[in-house]
Amino acid sequence: MIYTETSLPGVHFIDMEPIEDSRGFFSRFWCSNEMQTQGLPFEIAQINASLNVNAGTVRGLHYQRDPHAEAKIVSCTSGSVFDVAVDVRPDSATYLNWLGVELTADSNRLLYIPAGFAHGYQALADNTKLLYLVSEPYAPGAEDGLRFDDPAVGIVWPLDVTSVSVKDTEWPLVTGVT
């Protein structure tokens, strides 16, 4: 596996290194020892899956506050997605900076998003599926989020937003983030 830090410090690409033959390929998807070696300690507490029926669907931006802040490793298993991480740590030099990357089912690329970052995505194709590993169990009392269209963050979604949950439209604007 190849680990590369992105332009947003703390967020990393994890590229699988498939071993291919006439049957297809084999690749490690997760390795605790390698994560430790890379300085990215991560214990899997939960694994989530999502199906996004229509292109343009947006989910997020979600995170959990301390002491339940969570890191995620995101993989697109079908279709393609514009995956976004936003730094929500108020004391960070990159506070409210965001990174958007395309993940596809064929890329063998994962995205590591550390604790202290909000996560969201837009499906770029119909029937897009994601699988993500999460370092903390869901804690309803620690749940928080940013609006996907918050002008202070300024995310440029590649497609028109065709669907978003009511809950995700009701997150406070950045001025309400603590």
Predicted feature locations:
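Non-catalytic, conserved peripheral segments adjacent to functional cores
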Residues: 1-106, 127, 132-178
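Conserved metal-binding segment of the jelly-roll/cupin
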Residues: 103-125
